[in-house]
Each structure stands twice: as C-alpha cells, then as structure tokens.
Swiss-Prot record:
Annotated organism of origin: Mus musculus
Protein name: Transmembrane protein 192
Compartment(s) of residence: Lysosome membrane; Late endosome
The keyword Phosphoprotein belongs to this UniProt entry's keyword annotation: yes
Family: Belongs to the TMEM192 family.
Length: 266
C-alpha cells in the first residue's frame, strides 16, 4: 500500500511539473503550416540558357572561320592574306587564333559558372545530378584546351617550316571542325541532362530514397544491399547526406523558432 501511494504521488508530481512547464503552454503548431514551411523548395539549375548561348557562339565562330579561311585556300593567295582582305590588317590565321582564344575564355568562365551552381545544388541534397555530370561539365573545356594545344603545335611547326602555308590553314580549320563536333556533343548531352532534371523537379536524394524504401518495388531485399558499386562512392554519398541533413536541421530549427514566436506576437 505504501509503495502504491508513493507511485501515485510521483505520477501526480510529474503531471504537475508538466502543467507548470512554460514550454508546454504554447499552442501546438498547425500541421498545414509546418508542411508548408518544411517542404523542400526546388531550385532549377540556371545553366541551360548559358550553355545554349555558348553553343550558338561556338557554331557562329566556326562558320565565320570557314567563311574567312576557305577563300584563302584558293590559288595565288598573297602573303597568306585573302584577296578580299576580310581580316585586314590581321592575317587570317591571326584572326582565327584570336577568336579561338576568346572562345576558350568564354568556356573557362562557363565552367566556373557551372561549378558554382552545381556545388549549390549538391549542398541542397541533389548529389546524384552532381555526380552524374561531374566529368561532363568540364569535358568541353578540356576539349578546347586540347584544341589550343594542337593549334599551338601547328603554329610552332609553321614558324620553323613556313611552307606550304595552305596546309597549315587547312589543318587549323580541321582542328576547329573536330573541336566543334566534340564540344557540341558534350554541351548537348549536358543540356539534355539538366533539362530533364529541371522538368522532373525531384526531391532531395535523401527524401527520394525514403520514398523508394517506403514503397519497395524492385529493390533488393538482402540486408546491407547497396546500389553503388565502390566504397569511395558510398563514402561520398554519406558525406553528401550528412552535409544536407546538417543544413536541413539548421533550417528547420530556424523556422521552428519563427513559428513558435508567431502566437506570442499576435
């Protein structure tokens, strides 16, 4: 009987302490408000427009290079200049090389721009699109850098062996054409991937995996099964998840404090 009395007294003390707790006096937050505040907002990647513009600039440059260089391949060019002097006072090769340098700088700026936005997407929890375009978003710049190396090699050889001048111009135009084909393939593939990502408007990878595990259809049932193939990918994926969860928890804490102070303001 004494033990039962002590148990009843302790339960009454707990209930009284809960009633006296000021944190529990606040009104419960409405479910629809929490759902609206904590639902992750999708931010599309804005790199598609810049990629399309750069693709157009590249095509225009190569077309102008051919329109300027092909007349110089006709018989009797005067001192490696076109008869019409399209690029006067510069030589044709000089104008093409300068245009190629400007195009490379644009690709360098584009690569930095893409890296910046992809890092932001990765911090929001979309590590899958970051990994799937890791090499693709830098491949166009690598192709242009390789083209610059080939052009530099041609200019060095031409400096030592100036004749025949037509052959070097033909090789320069061939390098530009090959570079255009490879670069366009990379940019088009990148644009298609990013457009699909923007149209799909997926949830962060953590929430997408929760949906898959909540409604398993074709997933393997073995314990410890992972779809990634290497330990490095597993560690990188876990790192991305931890960074996203830390950022998400900080955002949730901030919004909870804002919602909790709203009844007091009113």
């Amino acid at each position: 009987m004494a033990a039962a009395g002590r148990l009843e007294d302790s339960s009454l003390d707990i209930l009284q302490s809960m009633d006296d707790d000021p944190l529990l006096d606040t009104q419960p937050l409405p479910h629809h408000s929490l759902q609206a505040q904590f639902r992750p907002r999708f931010h599309p990647l804005p790199t598609v427009i810049i990629a399309n513009l750069l693709l157009l600039i590249h095509v225009v440059f190569v077309v102008l290079a051919f329109l300027t260089g092909v007349p110089c391949l006709y018989p009797n060019p005067t001192e490696d200049k076109c008869p019409e002097n399209y690029t006067s006072p510069l030589k044709v090769q000089t104008a093409i090389i300068l245009g190629k340098l400007i195009l490379w700088i644009l690709h360098l700026l584009f690569e930095r721009y893409v890296q910046y936005h992809h890092r932001k997407v990765r911090s929001r929890g979309y590590s899958q699109i970051y990994r799937s375009t890791r090499h693709l978003k830098t491949l166009a710049l690598t192709i242009h850098s390789s083209g610059n190396t080939a052009l530099l090699l041609l200019l060095c050889v031409q400096h030592s062996f100036p004749e025949p001048s037509k052959l070097y111009l033909e090789l320069i135009l061939a390098v530009l054409a090959l570079e255009l084909i490879c670069s366009l393939s990379c940019l088009i593939l990148y644009i298609v991937k990013i457009r699909r990502f923007n149209r799909a408007k997926p949830l962060p990878d953590v929430l997408e995996e929760e949906k898959i595990y909540a409604y398993p259809s074709n997933t393997a049932s073995e314990t410890g099964f992972r779809t990634v193939s290497s330990l490095e990918e597993i560690v990188e994926k876990q790192e991305d998840i931890i960074v996203y969860l830390k950022r998400h928890n900080a955002l949730l804490s901030k919004r909870l404090l804002e919602l909790a102070t709203q009844p007091a303001r009113t």
